[in-house]
Structure formats: C-alpha cells, structure tokens
Amino acid sequence: MRADGNLTQWAAPGFPDDTLLLRDIARGGGFVIESVIPSEAKESLVAYFALLPSPEPTYDYIDGAWLTDAPYGVIHRMASYPDVHGIFTAVLDFAAARYAHLRIDTHRDNHIMQHLIEKHNFTYCGIIWLEDGTERLAYER
C-alpha cells in the first residue's frame, strides 16, 4: 500500500493484530488463500480476508445511503501478496456464494482497492467512520 501512495491506511504498527484476526476466525469469518507465488514456484499463503455477517456497527451511520436494508456480508481486512493475481475476484466469488448483498469499505488513498471494487460492480454509497474516527469510502452490491 505504501508504494502506491497509501501512507496512512494500516499505518499503526502491527495492524491488523493477532487479536483482531483471531476474533475474525472465532466468528467463522477469517479466511486465508493459498496459491503458488510465481517467483517462488511453491504453494504459499497469499491472502487473508474477513467475511462477516451483518450488522457491521460502523455501517449504522453513512453520509450517503445504502442500496438496501437487507442482510449482507461485509468484507474486511483484504490483504494479498502483490504478485498473485485474481485474489479479489476469488474472494468475491466466495462471498457472493454466501450472501446476496455485499458491503465493503476502503481508505480514500487506497486507489487500487477502489479500482477493484468499482470494476466488480459495487456502487459507491457514501462515507462511513471507523471507531477511531477515520473515514472510509463505502460500497455495496
């Protein structure tokens, strides 16, 4: 993220930390993806994401409007190895098989994630705020 100009998202040392990831896993929503890293030619852990059921407390207030009030799945903490392609598509396929409606948010400076979100037919819905007061761009499909 830093190399692409996103200097502030996940800037806190150790974020996301083990406690948060273990909480995702305990809720049945922490997932890893294994694949072959081209430069290493061996199977490795290449991505992590959380797919959690609604409600998401930080989505209760939005400066804008959600597309629906129906139950949804929310994708959080999407992180992947940069040289392995197709991860986001695989995550969305996995999520869409489980939820009719999906929501996701990202940092204003995370242009790569914004591009991927919009490319995969999400609609920009507005701005939400995290518990620490930082804003995120929010999307739904």
Predicted region positions:
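Conserved acyl-donor/pantetheine-binding loop and adjacent beta-alpha core of acyl/acetyltransferases
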Residues: 50-83
